[in-house]
Amino acid sequence: DLAFWIHTDSLEPKYEKGAVVLIKQTYYDQAGAIYAIDFDGQTLIKRVFREANGIRLVSLNKKYSDQIIPLDEEPGVIGKVIDGFVPLNLEEIK
């Protein structure tokens, strides 16, 4: 299993920029779940829906538009997001 840093605000309000999400390596098995997708050399973490012409990636933050990736462009499922957290800033604790 894997962990990824979130570098944008596209998953807010659930996961803020700077959070870490935990990924269970699996295949696509649940419409609307949040997945890590490998596409064109990038890892995209979005809510995923299977469409007739591809997969639809949906940000949780409504300011972003949906993205359709055609299946012939071979997007790959890395795994499903199972949890997330914001790491502690140890300097703030001292």
Regions found by a protein language model. Give the residues of each.
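Acidic/glycine-rich C-terminal interaction modules and beta/coil loop segments
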Residues: 1-94
